[in-house]
C-alpha cells in the first residue's frame, strides 16, 4: 500500500456520504429490486414448508431497504405465517435508519425484528460460544463479504446455519464488472487496512465449489455514472472517487502517478463506456444462491 493513503472505512461519516452518493448515481438498488420482483419468489418457494415460523437472518443489512422488499416476498408466499427477522449490522447509524424504516412500513404485523449491533464475525463468535445454533430458512449477505477477514470460514459457518430447504443468498460485484480489473491491478497499492478485501463473486463461486456446496448464480446488469470523478474540485466527484478506490480523500492524498493511472483506467473500456458525454462504470453484480446440505 502507498504510504499516506487511509481506508475510506476509517472515516465512517465520509464512507456513509460516499455510499449514499454511489446509490444515487448507480442502478445498484434498482437491479436488486428487479431481481427480488422477478426471481426471488421462485428461490423462496419452499423455504417455509409446514413451518409455523419462518426464520430469516440478514448479515450487514444496512438501513433495511432491500431487506423489507425481500420480507414482503416471503409474506406474499406464506401469508399469515410469522416471520422472525434477525439483523446483524455493525453500524449503529444504519440500525437506527432500519428501525425508522420499519416504524413507517405497513403490513409488518406478522414480522418480529431483532437487531444485533455486531459484525458478522462477532455474531459467529457469540453463537459458537453460546452453543445455541438457530437454523434459518433464509439468510442473506448483500455486498458485505468484502468486510470479513476469513471469507471461506464465514461462508462455511453461515451455510451451516441453514435449515432444511433453507437458502443462503449472496450479492457481490461480478467478476466481469469494472471493479474486478481495478482491484486486480491496484489492490496492493490501495489501503486494505484489514478493513476491506477485494473479492468478487467469481472468487466466492470458487470457494463454494471447493467446499462441495450446491449453488446457482445470476448476473445482474448495473451501471454507475462516474462523470463527475473527472472534474477536479467537484465534491461529489471526489466522494465517488473515494468510494471507487475505498480511499479517504483519494485525489488529494494519492501519489500523482497512481492517481493519474487510476483515473485513466476508470475511463478505459475494461471499466466503463462513454455514452452521450457521460462516463458509465460497469457495476454489474452477481447473485449466488446456496442450497442447504
Swiss-Prot record:
InterPro entries, alphabetized: HHMT-like, SAM-dependent_MTases_sf
Coiled coil regions in record: none
Entry binding sites for substrate: 28, 283
Reaction catalysed by this enzyme: histamine + S-adenosyl-L-methionine = N(tau)-methylhistamine + S-adenosyl-L-homocysteine + H(+)
Gene3D superfamilies, alphabetized: Vaccinia Virus protein VP39
Subcellular location: Cytoplasm
GO biological process: histamine catabolic process; methylation
Stated role: Inactivates histamine by N-methylation. Plays an important role in degrading histamine and in regulating the airway response to histamine.
Name by which UniProt lists this protein: Histamine N-methyltransferase B
Lineage of the species this protein comes from: Eukaryota, Metazoa, Chordata, Craniata, Vertebrata
Gene name linked to the record: hnmt-b
